[in-house]
């Protein structure tokens, strides 16, 4: 009952501009997940970056279930199963980024280019549905919530991962 599992995985590619590059980034996500990505919009105008409010600047996709577990494993293999302590949040989630999408096993296409992406992994225990259901919503108890230490321990057991205290000097 208290085992931790992946609730969802969100893959995000932030291009910071709309147009052709954003469409190609969405195509990369679609090839990777076989799902249609959603576009993220700018919250406010930033003149120095030539971004207008409500302009599409990123694309992301939410993956659940066994497919999410497989994608997390492939992403962590790129990072050599090493994360730093700052990658884990207090609520038991963690995230990391990769520089090139071709490291995940996709073929390089010169017309598409190379995109980096962010992985955000949400962890939960069984019983979290009580907070999301429509009728008789309830709070998840403090002892049942996933903490930062629980998430780190799960990562080390599940993937034989290494958690470093600081980022390695590169």
Curated annotation (Swiss-Prot):
Main location per the UniProt record: nucleus
GO cellular component: cytoplasm; nucleus; ribonucleoprotein complex; ribosome
UniProt keyword annotations, A-Z: Cytoplasm, Nucleus, Ribonucleoprotein, Ribosomal protein, RNA-binding, rRNA-binding
Keyword Iron annotated: no
Any one GO MF annotation of this record: rRNA binding
Cell location: Nucleus; Cytoplasm
GO biological process: translation
Family: Belongs to the universal ribosomal protein uL5 family.
Subunit record text: Component of the large ribosomal subunit.
Described purpose of this protein according to its UniProt entry: Component of the ribosome, a large ribonucleoprotein complex responsible for the synthesis of proteins in the cell. The small ribosomal subunit (SSU) binds messenger RNAs (mRNAs) and translates the encoded message by selecting cognate aminoacyl-transfer RNA (tRNA) molecules. The large subunit (LSU) contains the ribosomal catalytic site termed the peptidyl transferase center (PTC), which catalyzes the formation of peptide bonds, thereby polymerizing the amino acids delivered by tRNAs into a polypeptide chain.
The protein, known as: Large ribosomal subunit protein uL5
Organism: Chlamydomonas reinhardtii
Gene name in the database record: RPL11
């Amino acid at each position: 009952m208290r085992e931790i599992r992946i609730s969802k995985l969100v893959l995000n590619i932030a291009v910071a501009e709309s147009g052709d590059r954003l469409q190609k980034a969405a195509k990369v996500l679609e090839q990777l997940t076989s799902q249609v990505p959603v576009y993220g919009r700018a919250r406010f105008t930033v003149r120095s970056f030539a971004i207008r409010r409500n302009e599409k600047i990123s694309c992301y996709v939410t993956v659940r279930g066994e497919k999410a577990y497989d994608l997390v494993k492939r992403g962590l293999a790129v990072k050599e199963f090493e994360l730093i302590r700052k990658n884990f949040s207090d609520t038991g989630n963690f995230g990391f980024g990769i520089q090139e999408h071709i490291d995940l096993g996709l073929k390089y296409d010169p017309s598409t280019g190379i995109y980096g992406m962010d992985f955000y992994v949400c962890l939960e225990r069984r019983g979290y549905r009580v907070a999301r259901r429509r009728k008789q919503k309830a709070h998840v108890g403090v002892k049942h919530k996933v903490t930062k230490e629980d998430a780190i321990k799960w990562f080390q057991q599940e993937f034989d991962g290494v958690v470093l205290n600081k980022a390695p000097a590169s």
